[in-house]
Each structure stands twice: as C-alpha cells, then as structure tokens.
Curated annotation (Swiss-Prot):
Gene that specifies this protein: rimO
Organism of provenance: Campylobacter jejuni subsp. jejuni serotype O:2 (strain ATCC 700819 / NCTC 11168)
Gene3D superfamilies with a match to the protein in the record: Methylthiotransferase, N-terminal domain, tm_1862 like domain
Protein name: Ribosomal protein uS12 methylthiotransferase RimO
GO CC list: cytosol
Flavoprotein listed as a keyword: no
Enzyme class label: transferase
C-alpha cells in the first residue's frame, strides 16, 4: 500500500479541507514520517505574511526530506492566492491545486495533473471525510467565502463571496458523525453569523441551531468566528437559551477604538460591540474569546492605549493578538503604514497584558466543578490524562490534566465531572469525580 503524508497548516477550516482530502485518499496508508511517504501534501495558509512564510518553509523542508520518485503536492489558500508566482518559483513541487478541488485530489494524483477550479469547494453531505485529532470532537464547516469588506483582509479575494451549505446537508453530516461516536462539535466559517445571508435569510444560524438541537446524541456544540455586524442580539440570546450550544462566544473584534473600527471597515462602533459583549458575558458559565490587530494603518497612540485599557478591564477568557500584516488586494495596502518598530513595540506591550488576562481566566477556574472530555495521554507525563473543558474549543483554549479519579479508569472521549484543583501556568490540574452520561 502506498504511503501518504499530509501537513495541514493554518486554521481549523483548512483542517476540514485536509480531512476531506484524506477521505478521498483512503486507499493510502497514513504515515508520520515524510521520508517514507510516496505522496506528500501540504495544505497551505495564505492569510498573513507569517503564515505565508511558514507554508513556503514547510514545502521546502518536505522536499528536502522526501524520497526519490515521491510526489509533492501543494494545495490550499496560498496556492490559490499566488498560483502563477508559485508555479514558477517552486520547481520542487510536482502538482499544484487551489481551494476548489479537494474532492478530486485522488484523480489529480492518479493523472499527475494540476487542477484549478474557478469556484471555492463547498462541502456537501456526500463528501468523504476522515476526522483527525479526536474520537469525540469534529469541526463542522457551514459556509465558505466572506462578504465583509475589512480593510486588512484578503480572504474574499481568493475564497470568494459567501456560499452557505444547505441546512439539510449540515444535519446529514452531523447525524452521520453522531452515529460514528462523535458528540462534540464546533461550527466554523469565515463569518458564521452570516450563514444563509447569501440565500436571503437573516436568521439562518438561529434556524440551524433549532435543527441541530433535534439530533439525539449531541452533547455539546459551539459557534466560532461570529462577526460583529451579522451577529444579532436574537442570535446571542438563542445560544444562551440552548441546551446543546455552549455559552462560548468567539468574536474577533480586531479593535475597540471607534476611529480604528471605522478605518478597518468593521461596520460596528465600540458602543455596539460592548453591548453585545456584555450580553454574552451575562450568560451562565460564559466563555469569551476574541482577537485584535495592532499597528493597522491609522492607529494612533491614543487608539492603542484605548485598546490596552479595554483588554485589561473587560475580562475575556482567551485573546489572540496579531501584528498588522500588509496584504495585497486589501484597502489598507495603500494606506500610510505604521512603522515596523512601532508595531513590534505595541505588540510586546499588549501581549504582556493579554498574558495577564488569560492567567486570571485560568486562575478563576480553581475550585470550580466542570464537565470535561478526556482527550488522551498528556505530554506532561504518564501520571496525567489530558482533557478539555466541555466549553472549550479543541486545542486552542487550554488543557486540563487529570491526576486523580474517584471513578476508576478514565475512558477517552468520555465526559466526566471534575474538580479543578490548581492552575499550573495555564494548565489546570483536576480530579475526576464522576462519569457523566453522554446522552
């Protein structure tokens, strides 16, 4: 049997695309050593400069490790965005494809031909897919593309306009995954709260929640990548009222200064953002994640200081911060740029603040009883079982280390009630109290 090595870079949306490719390459034996693979695939990210560099380095590194007569295939966002340039500049690569042909990857490899469809691939209920990284959790991609006009973001230029999956397609996929033992789901898209806007429906995500709740066997669900102008008060209240959807609110804000929100074309002012955030925060056991960009053109010291004070005071649970990346095909590309030195200085300042905020979020968990999912052996040592809080998204929100159990041996993928005993530098030490019925 021929061997396959696949490297998936970037976001969880890319991961789903990689899992689709794996589903269509099930005839291959997966291996974790590039030097032994007959086919090597890199699913690239082309979002910001650092991601582009990571993708190029990964391609060149795999070329150095590959064996003679193997096939190196490059796909994904970077390829879609820089197709002509990369095909000229990367003679190391054997086959190229973009973001439209994941279901045809087997055909492409068999025929040894490049494929570039004109439209972005949209998953259906019939898509073959092999879930990786968990036996209980899966990401569910509900749409592709984006209709927003953010000044810094090039995604619409290579992913295209919003294209939503039909609700029936998503429900069919969920039912299949539940039948296979999956019970924890994260719903994703470039802009999840605009789901079905392209079909003229403004409450599409609410209707999807209604339908998901009818499926027996789902233990938890959360929605990522809410957008400030498409996320309504009604949507937030519907999530809060749900017995299946966790009060997990992931809304990348990018800034809080009204001046910067206008320049960045975010569509909502700080008053509107704070109203929504306070509603989210009022929910029982709420968990708030966001992201910010520093150094975007037009950001003054006053804007940056306002952002820092807001980050200090609001009480987010998790925050990602990025230095502004100058990207072609964006409105900000031709604006007067903030000097790199200033951007780096601001990034260091806010990263320190963010670190302290996240530490407080972990610290407040001590003494709480939480539902957690066992995810496997911990890298911290043989005496710990790794787990995640049921509220959290997979991998990005933290790790719980269980080293005591009042309910015998712990099963992977099973839900337990745990008492959080200690915060160990953003990892929580816990004791398992009881097994929780998955139904």
């Amino acid at each position: 049997m021929s061997k396959l090595y696949l490297m998936s870079l970037g976001c969880n949306k890319n991961l789903v695309d990689s899992e689709i490719m794996l589903g269509h390459l099930s005839a291959y034996e997966l291996c974790d050593e590039p030097s032994k693979a007959d086919v090597l695939i890199v699913n690239t990210c082309g979002f910001i400069d650092s991601a582009k560099k990571e993708s190029i380095n990964a391609i060149l590194d795999l070329h150095e490790q590959r064996k003679k007569d193997s096939l190196l295939v490059v796909t994904g966002c970077l390829m879609q965005r820089y197709r002509e340039e990369l095909m000229k500049e990367l003679p190391e690569v054997d086959l190229f494809t973009g973001v439209g042909d994941y279901e045809r990857i087997d055909e492409m490899i068999l025929k040894k031909t490049n494929l570039f469809s004109n439209s972005t691939y949209l998953q259906s209920e019939n898509s073959k897919r092999i879930i990786t990284g968990s036996n209980s959790h899966a990401f569910i991609k509900i749409a592709e593309g984006c209709n927003q006009k953010c000044s810094f973001c090039a995604i619409p230029s290579f992913k295209g306009k919003l294209k939503s999956r039909e609700i029936s397609s998503i429900i069919a996929e969920l039912k299949d995954l539940v039948a296979r033992g999956y019970k924890d789901f994260s719903f994703i898209a470039q802009d999840t709260s605009s789901y079905l806007f392209d079909k003229g429906e403004k409450d599409g995500l609410i209707r999807l929640i209604d339908e998901v709740e009818k499926i027996k066997g789902i233990r938890a669900a959360r929605i990522l990548y809410l957008y400030p102008t498409s996320a309504s008060e009604a949507l937030i209240k519907r999530i809060i009222a749900s017995e299946i959807f966790i009060n997990y609110f992931d809304m990348p804000l990018q800034h809080i200064s009204d001046n910067m929100l206008k320049i960045m074309k975010r569509g909502a002012n700080s008053t509107r953002l704070k109203e929504m955030l306070n509603l989210m925060k009022s929910a029982p056991n709420s968990f708030l994640r966001t992201g910010f960009i520093v150094g975007h053109p037009g950001e003054s010291e006053a804007d940056f200081e306002e952002l820092c004070e807001f980050v200090k005071d609001f009480g987010f649970d998790r925050i990602s911060v990025f230095a502004y990346s100058k990207e072609e095909d964006t409105a900000a590309f031709d604006m007067e740029q903030v000097p790199f030195k200033v951007i780096n200085k601001r990034l260091k300042i806010i990263e320190k603040i963010v670190d302290e905020v996240i530490e407080k979020s972990f610290e407040k968990e001590v003494g709480q009883k939480r539902l957690v999912v066992c995810t496997g052996k911990s890298s911290e040592g043989e005496f710990f079982i790794a787990a995640k809080d049921l509220r959290w998204d997979r991998e990005i929100d933290g790790e719980i280390l269980i080293n005591e159990s009042e309910c015998g041996n712990l099963e992977m993928g099973q839900i337990y009630e745990c008492e959080i005993l200690q915060n160990l530098d953003k990892k929580l030490l816990a004791k398992a109290l009881r097994k929780v019925d998955a139904n």
